[in-house]
Structure formats: C-alpha cells, structure tokens
C-alpha cells in the first residue's frame, strides 16, 4: 500500500524495482519497459500472477502470492548489471508458459506432442512447471534426451489424470512438480549425467503415482464424473488416439451427456421402466430414481464429444430427437474409436438404455486404462 492508501500490485512493485536498477540509463530503462510489456502483456495477459510464481519455483522453490515481491526483490531483481539478462530469461519462459496455456504444440507427429496435448486436455495448470522445463531442455536436444522428456511428460499426465478422476483436487502436485521441473532444468549442467538425472525425475514421478495408487477400470467404470472437465479429459485420451500424425487436434470440442443432466420426464419414464412402478413414486422410490439418474448421466458410458454449437442445440432433448442431429455433424463417440462396427456405438443403436450405458462404460474403461498407462 502506498502513501495514499492505495494497494499496489506486486507486479507493479517488481517493475518499479527493475526500473530502479536501471538508474539514470535511459536506454536501459526503455529496454526494461519493452521487455516488461512483451512478457506481461503480450505473452501472458491476465495469467501473469501464476507465471511469476511458477517461474520462481523453477529457479528456487514454490512460493505463495504473498511472497512474490519479497522473493523477486531478494533473488531475481537484486543486481543492476544482470537485470536485462534476467528479464530476457523471464521472457523466454513466458513463451513456454503461453504455449502450455494455449495448447500450441503443433501436429500429433510425435509421442512428445501427444503427451503435451493429453496434459492440456486436463484443463489444469499445475503441470506447467514441468511443461516449461521440458520445452526449455527439448530445444535442439539429442534424440535420446527427447525420449526421456517424453517419458516424463507421460508420467506427469498419469499423475494429473489419476488425481482428477479420483477427486483428489486439481492442484495436489502444485508444490511437487516444481521440484521435479527444477531437476529437469539442472540436468543440462553435465551432459554426461543428464540422462541419469532425467531417469531419477521419471522414477520420482512413478513413485508418486504408486503412493496415490494408479487408476483401475473400476475407478473409471463406476466414477460419477460430475465435473465436465474430468470426463472431457478422459474422452480426449481416446480422441487424440484417432487424430492423424500430420493434423493438429481440435481443442474446442465440448462434453455432451447423451442422457442430459436435466432430462425431460418422458425420457426418464422410458429409461426407468426397469426401476419398477408408475408415478406417483414414493419418497424412497424417488431417491432411488434420482440416484440412478446420476449413475447414468455422469457415467463415462454416457459421454461423447462434439462442437459447442451442436452441444447447445441438442441440449435436453431425448435420444430419439438427438440422434438425427448427431448424425448431421462431427461427433466423437469413444466406442467408435475402439471399433467402427461395435454394436454399442451411438450410430448403431436405436435406444439409449441403462444397460447400454453400463456396457459402454466397461468397454471404454478397459481401453482407457491401456491407453493411459501404455
């Protein structure tokens, strides 16, 4: 807070500190202002507060928002002679961060890019620390180094997807990943031991997965995927397996619940004839029906991917009215990825039933476990 009682952002304080280090050197001041704009406006936009914490974690340790100014004052912007060099370093990593944020990874012509797209599909940011470190090391690296970096990305993805599917939160590894990312960056110090260092990082990630226990088919098959981003991430695992090597995947596909979250009464009546009885239902039966609704609606067997425009147009329609609209557009049905002729595929069924959803979930969960851990 300044002498007028106004709160000043840590970012503004940091900028003033950098300019102060330039002294009366107008050329140096102009260079700082130009770099600052490039980093915090052009590259990062509104995501600068996350970046400055994650960047510091790569250099030193993970920090909280309240620590930002003090740590940057004491560790980063503490030397007039090197202020431009450090800003250029920030600029370089802000580009890496921006790529993680936008999903700018190119075509699916390598396992490296595919692993990045999988991480991006989780809609989490905790992996950005490792993403930035990997981007930095992968530039002009030897093929064998790229291979180990790819393995590290895959292991990171397994941790993230396991965490979100099992409902462990979205930032469980926010302090753990920077430690591993720092080791990745430091591996370049000695080319003779670089692979050994990367092997240790990979082993650390695999050990962490063992601690929290890897996903099983039962986890996926029975999970109530109420959070759309979690179910969407699982569907994207399968979608990315179908995209051609020379093609950039569509990142804007949205999750569709075939049995909608707010299903019309007539549609539920048809689905729930197997539950037994006719309305009006008793309180006990109503509770049972509502539980069954959730088990169906938020089941992986009830999920597909489609464009956001089509998603809004089919909305709460029953399956009989949805299916013609599905057939008019590009719809990603996980079952069709497993087998084009499968009798569980959306295009091959006339009714969307409880038994069908459960069978689809079994088939999809088996595929996902193999795909995630291969």
Spans of features found by a protein language model:
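Flexible coil/loop and intrinsically disordered segments
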Residues: 1-374
């Amino acid at each position: 807070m300044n002498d007028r009682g106004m709160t000043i952002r840590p970012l503004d304080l940091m900028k003033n500190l950098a300019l102060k280090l330039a002294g009366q050197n107008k050329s140096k001041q102009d260079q700082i202002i130009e770099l600052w704009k490039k980093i915090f406006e052009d590259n990062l936009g509104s995501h600068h507060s996350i970046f400055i914490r994650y960047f510091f974690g790569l250099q030193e340790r993970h920090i909280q928002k309240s620590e930002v100014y003090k740590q940057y004052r004491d560790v980063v912007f503490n030397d007039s002679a090197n202020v431009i060099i450090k800003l250029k370093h920030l600029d370089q990593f802000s580009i890496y961060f921006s790529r993680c944020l936008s999903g700018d990874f190119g075509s699916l012509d390598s396992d490296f890019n595919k692993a990045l797209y999988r991480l991006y599909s989780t809609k989490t940011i905790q992996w950005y620390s490792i993403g930035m470190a990997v981007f930095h090391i992968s530039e002009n690296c030897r093929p064998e180094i790229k291979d180990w970096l790819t393995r590290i990305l895959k292991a990171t993805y397994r941790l993230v997807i396991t965490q979100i599917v099992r409902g462990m939160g979205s930032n469980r590894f926010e302090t753990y990943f920077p430690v591993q990312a720092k080791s990745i960056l430091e591996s370049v110090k000695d080319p003779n031991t670089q692979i050994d260092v990367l092997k240790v990082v990979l082993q650390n990630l695999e050990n962490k997965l063992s601690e929290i226990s890897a996903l099983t088919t039962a986890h996926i098959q029975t999970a109530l995927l109420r959070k759309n981003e979690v179910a969407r991430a699982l569907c994207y695992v399968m979608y990315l397996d179908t995209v051609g090597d020379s093609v950039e995947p569509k990142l804007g596909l949205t999750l569709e619940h075939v049995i909608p979250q707010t299903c019309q009464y007539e549609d539920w009546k048809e689905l729930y004839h197997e539950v037994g009885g006719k309305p009006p239902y008793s309180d006990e039966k109503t509770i049972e029906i509502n539980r069954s609704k959730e088990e169906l609606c938020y089941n992986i067997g009830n999920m597909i991917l489609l464009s956001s425009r089509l998603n809004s147009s089919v909305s709460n329609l029953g399956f009989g009215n949805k299916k013609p609209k599905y057939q008019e557009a590009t719809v990603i049905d996980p079952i069709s990825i497993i087998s084009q002729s499968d009798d569980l595929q959306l295009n091959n069924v006339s009714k969307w039933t409880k038994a069908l959803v459960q069978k689809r979930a079994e088939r999809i969960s088996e595929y996902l476990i193999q795909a995630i851990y291969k």
